[in-house]
Amino acid sequence: SPLLPAGFYYKTFMWPANFWGKYEYFIRKSAGLGKSPTKPDPDLYEHRYIHCDVLVIGAGISGIMAAKTAAKNGLKTLLVDEKPNLGGSTIYQDSDYFKINNQNSSSWLEKEINEIKKLKNLEIKTRTSVAAFHGYNFLLARENLTDHLPIEQRGNRIRHKLLKIRAKKVITATGSIERPLIFDNNDRPGILLSSAKI
C-alpha cells in the first residue's frame, strides 16, 4: 500500500522515543506479527555430531551411486535427502522410455536401494535438509523425525534433530530443476521440456 510501505514502522515511529511503548501495540497488530507464545515449546529437539569420510547430499541416481561407490571402497559414508524416499526425480519419471542399464528405472532403483541399505558403513538419512555449509566441510542439517506423522502419533517423540556434520569430502548431488528457454512461440503445441518428453 502507498500509505503503509513495507517496513514503515521502522522509520516512521522513531520519535519521540518515549512514545514507542504506545505505538508498538498498534504497529504489531497492523503488521500481523501476532503474539509471542507465553508457554514453553512442547516439542522435543535433539542434536547429534556426525563425523564421516564422505557426505553425499541428494539421493537421486547420482547420489545413490556416489554413496554406494564410497561405501564399497571402505569409506564411512552419510547419504542425506530432504524427501521421504530415495530416488529423486527417478521416482516420478518411471516409464518404458526411461531405462537405466537396460532396466526399467523403477526396478533398477529398487535393486540399488536394497543393495545400499545392506552396506554397513553407509548411513542413510531421509527427510533431512542441509541448511548450512561452513568452512572445512562443517555442515548443519535438520532431520524431521515426526512432522509427517498425524498429531496423535507423535507423542513425546523427538520432532527435529540438528545434525552437526564434519566430513572429509562432500558430494553435492542435489539434481536440478529444468528451466525453460524463452523464445517466440515457445508455448505452441509440440514444444516440450526434455523432462516432459521422458
Residue ranges and their predicted role:
Residues 62, 84-85, 177:
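Conserved Rossmann-like nucleotide-cofactor binding loop
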Residues 73, 95-96, 187-190:
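Glycine-rich, phosphate-binding/catalytic loops in enzymes
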Residues 49-78:
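N-terminal Rossmann-like FAD-binding beta1-loop-alpha1 element of flavoenzymes
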